[in-house]
Structures are given as structure tokens and as C-alpha cells.
Amino acid sequence: PAYEILSGLVGSEMCIRDSIYNVLPGTTSAASVKAKFLKRLILKDDSVVEIDQKLAFDLLSHMKGGPSVEVLLDLAFHEDTKIAEQAANVLKTQVFLYEADTNRLEEKYNAGNKIAEDILESYSEAEFFTKLNAIPEKIKVVTYVAAEGDISTDLLSPGNQAHSRSDRELHGQCFISKKAQDEISQLKIAHPDKSVMLVAEKGTMGVGSSRMSGVNNVALWTGKKASPYIPYVNVAPIVAGTNGISPIFLTTVGVTGGIGIDLKNWVKKKDSDGNIILNNDGEPILEQLYTVETGTELTINTKTKKLYNKEETKELVDVSSSFTRQKVEFMKAGGSYSIVFGKKLQNFAANILNKDPAPVFASPREIHSEDQGLTAVEKIFNKNAVGLTSDKKLVAGSDVRVKVNIVGSQDTTGLMTSQELEAMAATVISPSLDGAYQSGCHTASVWDIKAQDNIPRLMQFMHDFGLITARDPKGIYHSMTDVIHKVLNDLTIDDWAIIIGGDSHTRMSKGIAFGADSGTVALALATGEATMPIPESVKVTFKGDLHSHVDFRDVVHSTQAQMLKQFGENVFQGRVIEVHIGTLMSDQAFTFTDWTAEMKAKASVCISNDDILIESLKISKKRIQTMIEKGMDNKNQTLKGLVDKASLRIEEIKSGERPALKPDRNAKYFAEVVVDLNEINEPMIADPDVSNVDISKRYTHDTIRPISYYRAEKTVDLGFVGSCMVHKGDMKIVAQMLRNLEKKSGEVKFKAPLVVAAPTYNIIDELKEEGDWEILEKYAGFQFDDKNPKQAARTEYENILYLERPGCNLCM
């Protein structure tokens, strides 16, 4: 019936556009119908006046993979040699081939088929890449300052509009503001020969998360169309910041073949002796080197790797880091995925033809140091490295393709991840992964009509793909809305593991975890691998004793304050924080590692001793077993496999065969921060400093103050204990405080609203076993109901205790 409908489109240009052009590529059901229909047109089994054979092949060439590649292979091996040759020429441009496709090529080649041989020869030479146009030598840009200070990804793609992220046209309407959208549109009209460069003046671009939807929105408003036949998918955005681009956001920019520029247009003013000059508030005085105010015309030279003024008479800043050979490859190919899949395809073809692949792509940068020990992250990367050319150990700065152990997909970005998987033509999870999890935490707080429509579809897709899902597509087991990072922390059963998660707070107390955009998550799910440079590390150790009246949260804040005091700038940005937490259990260590996302660190890794690691692994085993008992395991018995691997790791540690991860004594660090616990003598407050006269210093995460600074003059508007930044111990403290108040006064009265949201159901179960949940329930004026969850966000609060559903209530 679909073919009959499509065949009736003769003479209707609008119908042709909407039914043929505007179809999402990859493995979508519409793409399957489209590919088969185009095959019928090529074979003249059907006809549409507006689509001749040449256009039909052109349309197939833009469909990326899956059913389109299947059709192209059918046509390449067709008896009509003219059709076969045309299909082969299109196939030579495609990179999203999977095992079923490559198996067909190999079989035909082994049977002596010349077309198959011709295609494989082309792949071995990487003609799908070499025949693409080079990036322009000169890129003319006009600036648009989106804001002064750090720009959160929430400005580019608001969290409260997460339901529409997979609908690029609709979600694009929430980009910054209507005023900004109009101003950008006017700049494009006034400068048709230039690209609009989005700027964070006096700040860092893209802090807070990787936010693929944020990059999509920037590309939608300022980038270029990826294909004339694919709606609302743009590539090549250009973003910039005085202090550069946040590391995880920069990775996402690379996914779309974009450019991220560190402007360095403001510097700290120095005196004649080279000392930084401070103002009356003790803050460095900034000096402007050149302007990037909205409407400024600049030129990027991709050959000299410099940023120039409009006339190209003055060099403004070196941008070599923006145009490494690998990044230029991403730009040329329209994104990093094409390079990842292209390399695999080239290696496959070369192997079949028994030849070396053509040296087309940038060789991975391999940095060795014979007399240097390894940091913890360097050890993890070396253990998990794939395809190394030598046995020499790699150090920071080396480009490495690594095996990924655990992958997490988040529910507000999951629909985008599923779209990316469809676009890559992926249909099943990589068997090399230890496990993968689809969360339901960000839609736990408000189960509105949008979530009710979107999330069941997402859970079904991910379940079919091979993930453990928070919600049961069959509706049998109890929905688990636990915070994604907490679940991944439990699922991580090896301190040498690499974890990729679809959320900026993907930080673990075991192994090393990287927050990633939905596309990188999709790539990890499909291939079981990730590619990135080994990051530099900053070592954090502690001295002194922690006073009994302060909390570990105060240690977290003080680490930030003492680091800034020691170095004058954020040495954590873009690096791994290697924290030596010693005897902290995994839940407490998680509190520290989760915070590192706020300091713009790329990741964090915890160094603990053997006994503590064993206890942490036992906690993981218990919690995974609980998931199994709830009926959450899949047909592959992923969860059972994790329990078995945890048991094996415990035995390795006990026997001394493979002790807990530790860096070498002579490891090289970018910096070493020593936190003096004796200095922490009162609670520490992280202040967004919203009234700072310097706008760029607001919302920076850099203002840490002792509670005495506020002289007890502040009123508390609302208290919140929960979500990913707390652990069970924090919940027990709240319970004990209620007991203490009850004992003292006979009752507990609330003078402000208090919201308590356990991160996971496991923690609630444990609090019930340990007698702490009872007191929380006793004084709760509201308690979540799984059978009747909230369907709208709460905007007004009474002075009562709210016991909210486990999940990401704070953010959402």
C-alpha cells in the first residue's frame, strides 16, 4: 500500500518533498519504505515523473545505511550492468555498513564478482573520504555574543524542554530566546557570505553538559544543511569562548563536524614585574586584546591556523588546537561518526584484499615516556586500548581507541540516542560491552503526557536493542526511576573499567567515566568502543584531620576553594581529577566524583585500598542481585554476568593477582592539589554569586564561602536533599536530625519547605531495613505514589516535608 501511495504522487511537488525528501535516514520504518520504493523506480517497476533514475540513486546516497545499503547491494549485484555500476559508485561513498552488508560483499568477492572487488578496492583506499571536498582555506565569520560569562548548555537547549529534543524543528524554537533567534537571522541576511560564530564573552562555552541537543540547536540556527533531502539536520556550527569550550561539549561539537575556538580575547593584566594586578575585591583585572562584540567580522585561516581581523591584516590568536589533523577530518567528513565507521570499513576491505589500508587518515598520536610512571587514567587507557602498534605504554596526550565496559543512556536524551542508532543503521548492542542501561530518572519527577508518550517507546527500542531498561516494556517489573549515575556506579564492577554515560554527571567511584552526548553514547552502544586522547591528570590528596562537626560535602567545596587559592585558576578544567580517597566507601566517594563535573573536569578517578574496593564491589553485587530479583535482567543475562564479573574481581584482589588500581609513584601530573582538612572548620557554601558586579563571574561555580560570611542574615526559602549529589549517609543524617528535634521539642515543625528525594529505590529499601525511612514518612506532608505519579511540575511549596520519587528531581 505504501508503494501505491508513493506512486500516486505524480505532479505534486509538495508531496514529493514531504514524502520522499523529508524522511529520516538509517533504519527508520519510513526509510525502509523509501529505499524499497526507490529501488522499484530504478528498476522501472514503478514511476514518478519527478524522480528519474539518477535522482533515485542520489536520494539513496543520502540515506546513510541500513535498508538503503541493502538496496544498493541488491542493485550492485543486479544483472543489468549499467544499474550495477551506478549502484557501486554510490556504495563507494557510504560508510555505515554492518556485518550483514560486509558479509554480502565478502561472499560476492570470494565468488569472483568484479563489482564487489571494485567496491572493496575503493574502500581500502578510503575513497569515501579522499573524494570529499577539503574544508575551505578561509572561513569568514560574524560574531554573535550569546551571553557574558560562562554559557551553560541549558541556554542552548533548556532542560525543561527535554521532551522535544528528538524533534529538531520544534526543539530549535527554545534556543536562547526569540530575540536572539531574530538577531542571528538578521546577521545571516546581512552577511550571506559568512558563518555566524556563537560566542561566550569572558567565559567558557557549553558548561554543564555535553548536550547534543544544544549543539543541534546551534547548528540549526547557524550551521549548514547536512543534506538537501534530510530536514532540520544541520552540521558545521562554529562556537567560541574567551576561555575556550567545555571539554565534553567540545566533543559534541566534533560529532557535527563543527569548530570550537579558544578566543583568549581577555587576559589578566600584569605589572612590569609580571605579577597579576588585582582590583579592590582581590579579583584579577582583565584586559581586552581584541573585540568580539556582536557583528564583528573575522576570518579563520585553516591553513595557517590563525584567527585574523576582517581585513586579514592582524593576527588575533593562534587556533591550532581547533584544527588538529583529526578535527579537520571530522570537519571534512561532516562529523566524527563517518570517520569512525570509515576507518573500520577501510580496515575490513584491506583485510579481505590482503593489503595494507591506504595511509589516508591521521595516525593516532602515540606519546611514550620510558622514564615516566603512569597515572591511574593512563593505566586504564593502556589496559583497554584497541589496535595499538607497539607494546610501549602510552601517556597523556596520546590518541587512543579504547574498549568501553559500561554504557548508560539517559531518558531525556535517549530518544536522540535511538535516532542516532537508527541513522547509523545499528540494530543490536555490541557484544563486547559488559552491560548497558537505559534510565528513567529524568522523567521520574514529572510523569506528564509528553513523558507518557515518549518514554514507553524509548524503553521498547532500547530493550529490543539489548539494554537493561529502567521501565519494563511489558509492564511486569516495578519501574526503577533511580538516578542514572547511581545505577551505573552499581553496575561498574571493575576499577579498571571505562564507562560512557549520556549525562554530564557520569562519574563513578570505580573505573573512569565520561559524560557524553547522545551520539557518542550511540557509537559506544553500537561499536563497544570510544576514541579520545588520554587526558592529563591532577592529583588530589588530603592532609590533616576532618573535624567531627563538618560533613564530607564541606570537603568537596573546600577542595574547590583551596585549589583556586593555590593556583589562581581552575587547573581541573579539561583534565582528570585523580582523587586519593583511601577509606571512603563507594557511595561517599561518588559524592566527590559527581561534584567534579561542576568543576569542568573531564572525568575523575578514585584511588582506594584493596579492602575498601572489595566492600564497594560487594555493595554493587547486592544491588545488582536486587535488580535481578525484581525481574530486570534480559535474555542475554547481562546482570548475572556483572555479578559473576564482580565475584571474579573480588577474588583477583584477595589473591593479589590484580590489586586495586593505583598510579605509579613516579607518575607525571599536570598539577598536584593538597587539601588541608584542618582548614575546614565550618560548613562551606557554594554561592552562584548572582549579584557580582562583574556579570562574567556569576554562576561560575568558583565562589566558595564559609557559612559565617552570611552572618546568619539569610533566610532559607527551600531545602533540598536528594538526587545524584547525595548518598545514603546524607539521608540517614536527615532522619537523625528529625529524631533529635523530636526528642528535644516533642515534635518537628518546618519553617520552610524541605524536599527529600532518595537517589535510588535500593537506598529506600536499605533505609527501611535500617529504621530510618519510618521517621521520614512520619513527618512527610507529601509522599510520592508510584501508582499515581505527579503529572505536572510543582511550582508552589508549603512549609512541609516532601518525600519525592527517586530520580533526578533537582535538575528536572
Briefly describe each language-model feature range:
Residues 13, 17, 49-53, 84:
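Residue-level detector of extended alpha-helical repeat arrays and alpha-solenoid scaffolds
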Residues 39-48:
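Acidic, Ser/Thr- and Gly/Pro-rich intrinsically disordered linkers and low-complexity segments
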Residues 1-16:
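Short, small-residue-biased leader/transition segments that mark boundaries at the very start
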Residues 22-34, 41, 58-77, 81-812:
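Fe-S-dependent hydro-lyases/dehydratases of central metabolism
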